[in-house]
Amino acid sequence: MASYPCHQHASAFDQAARSRGHNNRRTALRPRRQQKATEVRLEQKMPTLLRVYIDGPHGMGKTTTTQLLVALGSRDDIVYVPEPMTYWRVLGASETIANIYTTQHRLDQGEISAGDAAVVMTSAQITMGMPYAVTDAVLAPHIGGEAGSSHAPPPALTLIFDRHPIAALLCYPAARYLMGSMTPQAVLAFVALIPPTLPGTNIVLGALPEDRHIDRLAKRQRPGERLDLAMLAAIRRVYGLLANTVRYLQGGGSWREDWGQLSGAAVPPQGAEPQSNAGPRPHIGDTLFTLFRAPELLAPNGDLYNVFAWALDVLAKRLRPMHVFILDYDQSPAGCRDALLQLTSGMVQTHVTTPGSIPTICDLARTFAREMGEAN
């Protein structure tokens, strides 16, 4: 091919431009790195925040324990974010919890089909999850990097949440799937909506023998609830799988690599109590991933459809960074409180992002409690 002078000049020009561009990029990166380092140093001077999410199956004693712990602190350094009961009963929909239990009862009695139940349950679960998801989004801009737990000074503020968004967007939908009143596709739709896990997400799950759990649940009075032992077994199973899933992921487990180890057999209704990170990495069959080897999610070749596989990638990404703690509820309320207080000493704090973040977060939490807390 002929060589033309204009091509030669263009080539030389391109080389010079690339060389200058490379040097310019290196020069431009220096102030960016310096700016980033400055931002990190400034953040490290910001006050710290401790966020604790008390979660697990209903009826263990979470709310009582949390309220006793909050009572130990002053109004300015510890704030309780309750369940959004008013939203569930009035603001978001009418008597959502009662609607859920009634729908499950009607399905169990053969009065409605599984498809009809799934429509109601999916709609109700959207209502259950909305306050958690939107509050997480409003809080997120104020959460900086993790400050660690070892020898950390007391946080400027401790937020105690009655549940994390995964309760409404993962655990209870998964339990309803085990109960036959929600489809696996709907469960994964909720999974796709789980907000990104913020730094310093400390989640406290509970352990309590099943007979003691049944006794406590039978004695409590919550508007709209029924004593549904099958649902209790299902939600206990799901939270056990959740704890295992976090351990599995943090231990280096990859659901894509281990998918072939799943048998596709039905998930047993009962399992061991949640465990801390001690011990060997759980088998994938003892994690939440086992729920999703369902025929409805599989292509003709037996593989997951990609859209569902991507949802499981989201699940892994959301659960892996969580700091999970296990609280033994098989003791007195005061004993539970003291055990929870001891757990907080090993939890991970975060720096806030602005000097005004702490009062803003306090206002957010108190507004949530005032507007959406327990209905009168």
Curated annotation (Swiss-Prot):
One of its GO terms (biological process) is DNA biosynthetic process. Residues 19-35 have a biased composition (Basic residues). GO terms for molecular function: ATP binding; thymidine kinase activity. The active site is at 83 (proton acceptor). Keywords: ATP-binding, DNA synthesis, Early protein, Kinase, Nucleotide-binding, Transferase. Gene3D superfamilies: P-loop containing nucleotide triphosphate hydrolases. InterPro entries: Herpes_TK (IPR001889), P-loop_NTPase (IPR027417). Coiled coil: none annotated. Residues 1-38 are annotated as: Disordered. Phosphorylates and thereby activates certain drugs like acyclovir (ACV), valacyclovir, and famciclovir to a toxic form, that leads to successful suppression of the infection, while the uninfected cell does not have this ability because it lacks TK. Mutations in thymidine kinase may induce HSV resistance to antiviral therapies in immunocompromised patients. The most frequently observed resistant strains are unable to express TK and are avirulent in animal models of disease. Belongs to the herpesviridae thymidine kinase family. Catalyzes the transfer of the gamma-phospho group of ATP to thymidine to generate dTMP in the salvage pathway of pyrimidine synthesis. The dTMP serves as a substrate for DNA polymerase during viral DNA replication. Allows the virus to be reactivated and to grow in non-proliferative cells lacking a high concentration of phosphorylated nucleic acid precursors. Homodimer. This is Thymidine kinase.
